[in-house]
Amino acid sequence: MATELDKIFLILEIAEFIIGMLGNVFIGLVNCSEGIKNQKVFSADFILTCLAISTIGQLFVILFDSFLVGLASHLYTTYRLGKPVIMLWHMTNHLTTWLATCLSIFYFFKIAHFPHSLFLWLRWRMNGMIVMLLILSLFLLIFNSLVLEIFIDISLNIIDKSNLTLYLDESKTVYDKLSILKTLLSLTSFIPFSLSLTSLLFLFLSLVRHTRNLKLSSLGSRDSSTEAHRRAMKMVMSFLFLFIVHFFSLQVANWIFFMLWNNKYIKFAMLALNAFPSCHSFILILGNSKLRQTAVRLLWHLRNYTKTPNPLPL
């Protein structure tokens, strides 16, 4: 039977699901309608749409996972149900993270200005480089899936012990295997984080250089390029902040799950963990002029609709 904590946890998870769905469905619908209308799909819109679709899939997996943890946590230890849910969550999370990273890199090459020949060469081949990053992410996904499968097999075989911590103390070999596998899974998460952090640092350097050139030419410090730099930096910084919260929450959740199974604190870690797919879409909407203007028009129409008095029945 669900406790009060379980009910609060499920209510908050459903709220995160609704918030995330609203933002990502909006992004997908706007970009698809624009692509159909213009008969052309731009690279940024394509990445945004793929990111929205991937996040929608992740949100559904998260919702199912939350109901499983909140209402039937004992089923999580079953090999037939626990393994597919964990694998699906990691796959959708991997795709979402890498697509968000590709979007950060795309904005960097689209907005930043450097006279260096290497930067110009990479910028000229930006679309091909994004494709190569996506191919790299697929290879890493295969590697992660193989490592994760071994990790789950070992964990689910021992998680039904009455005292997992004591069992791991007695079996140092198993503990060492779990530690190595967990380290490998964590290291692969640092690759998209480091790429996004590098993009942010170079965006900042480009903004400083651009602002200094404007001051030297007596044109002030605000123009369209400066604003584009700042918007892109805010988007990448917000992504990095959410990613840091997401990454550390994942480590805490894994530790609680495998060392203190069925502990109530895993629910708080899951709430923080799932903030990334729920909130990131609204950061993307605010940072994209087309999406932001469409959202403002939609809210304006909804406001006018709610204020329109209903006609009296005859």
Curated annotation (Swiss-Prot):
Keyword Transmembrane helix recorded: yes
UniProt-listed SUPFAM superfamilies: Family A G protein-coupled receptor-like
The UniProt record lists the keyword 4Fe-4S: no
Sites carrying sugar chains: N163
One term under GO cellular component: plasma membrane
Bilayer topology: Multi-pass membrane protein
Pfam families linked: TAS2R
Subcellular location: Membrane
Extracellular side: 1-7, 72-101, 149-187, 260-265
Function: Receptor that may play a role in the perception of bitterness and is gustducin-linked. May play a role in sensing the chemical composition of the gastrointestinal content. The activity of this receptor may stimulate alpha gustducin, mediate PLC-beta-2 activation and lead to the gating of TRPM5.
Note: Most taste cells may be activated by a limited number of bitter compounds; individual taste cells can discriminate among bitter stimuli.
Protein name: Taste receptor type 2 member 42
Organism: Pan troglodytes
Gene: TAS2R42
